[in-house]
Amino acid sequence: MSNFDPKHFLLHCARKPGVYRMLDAEGGVLYVGKARNLQARLNSYFQKNVASVKTRALVGRIRDIQTTVTGSEVEALLLEQSLIKELKPPYNILLRDDKSYPYIRITRSDRFPRVTFHRGTRRAGSQYFGPYPSGSAVREALSLIEKIFQVRNCSDSYFRNRTRPCLQHQINRCTAPCVGLVSEEDYARQVTMAADFLDGRSREVADQLSTDMEAAAAALEFEKAALLRDQLAAIQAVQQKQYAETGQGDLDVVAIETRHGLAIIEVLMIRDGRILGHRTFRPDTRGEDDRSEILEAFLSQYYLGDREDPVKPQEILLCMEIPGAEALQQALEEQWAKKVRLAWRVRSDRAAWISMAQTNAQQSMATEMAAREHMEARFLALETLLESSEPIRRIECFDISHTQGEKAVASCVVFDQQGARKQDYRYFNVNPAAGGDDYEALEEAIRRRYQRVLKEQGRMPDLLLIDGGKGQMQRGWKVVQELDLHASIRVMGIGKGPSRRPGFEALYLPCGKEMIPGPADSALHLLQQVRDEAHRFALTGHRARRGKARKQSTLDEIPGIGPKRRKALLTHFGGLKQMRNASASEFARVPGINSQMAQTLYDWFHR
């Protein structure tokens, strides 16, 4: 790409709203931005007194700029977010946590509805409550629902195949509708009260339980009255420690804390007048140090992205003013088709909520900084242990997991001075011929990993750690030498020491040196942490691969079962165990399975 002349470009740049894309020498997109006036915004990048280190580094790599004129600043904002999500430019602030919020789901289409954890696309025939700030908040609420209202949480296949009550009934967390211990009418009443409770109408539920209890006592149904009394007491206990009341409506409170290039953003969630909790985000700031710029980028990606969160707050309280607040508010109103208010100058309760969110952000930052300092100290201890003249900033560790050679998986986990870099983790499905040979599997995985890193000019580790003894370490060192990386990558094996006791692991180096640092050594603690994570990641990958293969291989052996029928069977029953317990008539209920195929399936599983 030819040299870029900013002066010539700016002479012909439109003075209208739009989006700009900054390109490098290979045509890759470095940065995507929006502007009310494209010429004025782009001109600001090429001034002599630019203070931002990030901006100066960006400008030094620009070889071309492409622009798209839009009808308004709102359109520019929406297009900008679409391009950032698609292209993930290296100089844009990126929201790394793109996981959708969890909900509680009641399957209203079932004869005996179940109450479950849900994340993702909403399905017809179900009622949803939330969103909740975290999975733990959902599980806590579900535990409370089961304790008070005793509704089922089991899968449909498990429910259909019960012949006697399960443990949930024995510990008074389910009324056992699977075996007819509760009438459909009574169960429906419990589900309705559970839904009302989740909707925040706990007072109404308590009043209803009190009325039912008095009626049962008057009818001399003392066992039923005692059960209702216990339910009422549980709800009253919840009400005493109920979430803080905040008035009606849905709103989010957003606060930011920055320090040493790190940003922490807290989102305090208030739904139906109750503070449900908060969620912490750590956006990749890409060197940006302007708090308002980071906050604006976060808000745009968080609220304008395609997250599956149908509940949109009618008010968003901010800890500070952001430059594009008006355009963001208009974009939200356009996308959500309702009035939305962004506010930062507030009083009374709202000011207290902002203070609460800011306090959470400060606490999260303090915790994060302490963890980073601890990790950095461990890296320094490792450098001292290895007598390294070069800093160690990145460690990659490999481990192999298989069951007697079946479906072997190699894991590669990555750590730097900030901790685990899970976005850089990789699995490698090992060639079946090498599956039972840990040495061959390890060699294959390491070779594939670093051949690709070389090809893509990616980041190499400073230390390659291998879970295993001297033999595994030597195989890893062999591959590093083959790829001519021995001058830049240190290789180390970590295995059980002579005593085979935890904390007395032996470290093996290519030079033949062996070390046993001892259980108090900080460097060993770091290596143990990395090794244990590699082991966990490999085991998780192996179990998933083995389970998938066993499910598919068993069904694939049955005549007449192709991909569509296999998927329908697994969706309906959940697994092979449930299929083995199913009757021919139950197989016939599966979409796409006729009576003849149902009998074939039954005969196959009962050979």
Swiss-Prot record:
Known HAMAP family for this protein? UvrC
Q: Which organism is it from?
A: Alcanivorax borkumensis (strain ATCC 700651 / DSM 11573 / NCIMB 13689 / SK2)
Q: What processes does the entry annotate via GO biological process terms?
A: nucleotide-excision repair; SOS response
Predominant location category: cytoplasm
The UVR domain, residue ranges: 203-238
Task: List where in the cell it is found.
Answer: Cytoplasm
Segments for region (Disordered): 542-561
Q: Which UniProt keywords apply?
A: Cytoplasm, DNA damage, DNA excision, DNA repair, Excision nuclease, SOS response
Basic residues bias (residue ranges): 542-551
Keyword DNA repair on entry = yes
Entry superkingdom: Bacteria
Listed CDD domains: GIY-YIG_UvrC_Cho
Q: Which NCBIfam families match?
A: PRK00558.1-5, uvrC
- Please describe the quaternary structure of this protein: Interacts with UvrB in an incision complex.
Entry's SMART domains?
Answer: GIYc (SM00465), HhH1 (SM00278)
A GO CC term assigned to this protein in UniProt:
cytoplasm
Asked if the record carries the keyword Ion transport, the reply is no
Question: What GO MF annotations does this protein's record show?
Answer: DNA binding; excinuclease ABC activity
Stated role: The UvrABC repair system catalyzes the recognition and processing of DNA lesions. UvrC both incises the 5' and 3' sides of the lesion. The N-terminal half is responsible for the 3' incision and the C-terminal half is responsible for the 5' incision.
The family this protein is said to belong to: Belongs to the UvrC family.
The residue ranges of the GIY-YIG domain are 15-93
Protein name, UniProt field: UvrABC system protein C
